[in-house]
């Protein structure tokens, strides 16, 4: 049925209800059967299917279904654009109220015009007003060229709204199709981006790049999910398809509060904090041997269940949401199996972003430390490791949520500070007996301090080994730091979960104020 702008109204209520049903059928059909079939043939759900699958059954309440564009140029006066290419409204996820929007690629390629952007922004404003999370499925060819500057203005309003919501309600972007040009800045301004393997996101596409720079690149290589996860770090989760993306969004939301005035999520506690002796066997005493820190995480969180964030990016650092005794926490952990757990530019950015989010939404932070230092190298220095490393220092210093730090093994120099030691505001600091808390490793320190003795010795190698052991025993232990109050307790690894749970309970009522200011100057 074609859209009818001059509908002759029926003379009875029953007739008008029938007309309403017909009008709604046109709107819900989107771009029509042929375009819906094409969407399905590409392994993609339609805009309404995505919302219905994401939200609790029968909970979606659409708003603005009858909204229309007001453009008359370039044949737009005759164009049928149901819901102006975006479905907006409210519903619930696992019983929790949310606001959501979903671009409809079957309607003019999901292109964003004035009315579409207005609908999205109004939905975001309602999320802000009610203190509810906002979720948005992006699937659009970009700006609606027929509307000219009005479409550009619409993007600007969306960006402004993204920033207004930032730190107040969680924003989750799901890239489920093309997201090109200026449109890609909106998801970049949200808290989390979930991207399906069939989606693409870039400022300029392969054809433009080819014409300007001569570079040959495919859409997947340039802006596919794997590229954005492993190389650019623009996204937080990769999903196989729409179904998987919706499941990730639900799990992610389960760890988050509704807004910044609520405490961290607390559900389904696992009260078992009995010693887990398996933790004693994961971390080798020999600092040159690697291990997977995720094995440690699995032993200290409820049910061994956690949601890793940016799992494929800066893999020398692990960031994840989990629960300890039912309480939602954010975990930041060095990964010794990759680059020995060194902090580099990408890991610093990854950690700082995660810490900022957790602090914004009252989620306690747990640090698992095994870090030998910042990654040395000319490219790291030229790339701005000083500035990027400072982001971690800034984020942890600014954070006022409970901060619990556990030193598993190495904790050397400035990299230890960047992982939130006592001086950067850690509320509780624990160390395993394997911890080496020092300004630098024993080998490097011995080479500096005892350089003359080693050089003058009859057997320099034997003297070096002796001095390394001497320094190791004197300084690279947890007990010197404990004696100076830098560590609260040296603990049996088996007791780690109990110690963290106890500290989280103690600091659940933590309140900390800082000097009044408009905002700090975050090192960008």
Swiss-Prot record:
SUPFAM superfamilies: ClpP/crotonase. It holds the Pfam family Carboxyl_trans. Its EC number is 2.1.3.1. It is an enzyme of class 2 (transferase). PROSITE patterns: COA_CT_CTER (PS50989), COA_CT_NTER (PS50980). One of its GO terms (cellular component) is acetyl-CoA carboxylase complex. It comes from the Bacteria. Residues 13-268 form the CoA carboxyltransferase N-terminal domain. Keywords: Transferase. One of its GO terms (molecular function) is propionyl-CoA carboxylase activity. It catalyses: (S)-methylmalonyl-CoA + pyruvate = propanoyl-CoA + oxaloacetate. Gene3D superfamilies: 2-enoyl-CoA Hydratase, Chain A, domain 1. GO terms for biological process: fatty acid biosynthetic process. Residues 13-506 are annotated as: Carboxyltransferase. Residues 274-506 form the CoA carboxyltransferase C-terminal domain. Homohexamer. Transcarboxylase is composed of three subunits: 1.3S, 5S, and 12S. The core of the enzyme is composed of six 12S subunits. On each side of the core there are three pairs of 5S subunits. Each 5S dimer is attached to the core by two 1.3S subunits. Thus the total number of chains is 30 (6 + 12 + 12). The 12S subunit specifically catalyzes the transfer of the carboxyl group of methylmalonyl CoA to the biotin of the 1.3S subunit forming propanoyl-CoA and carboxylated 1.3S-biotin. This is Methylmalonyl-CoA carboxyltransferase 12S subunit. It comes from Propionibacterium freudenreichii subsp. shermanii. The lineage of its organism: Bacteria, Bacillati, Actinomycetota, Actinomycetes, Propionibacteriales.
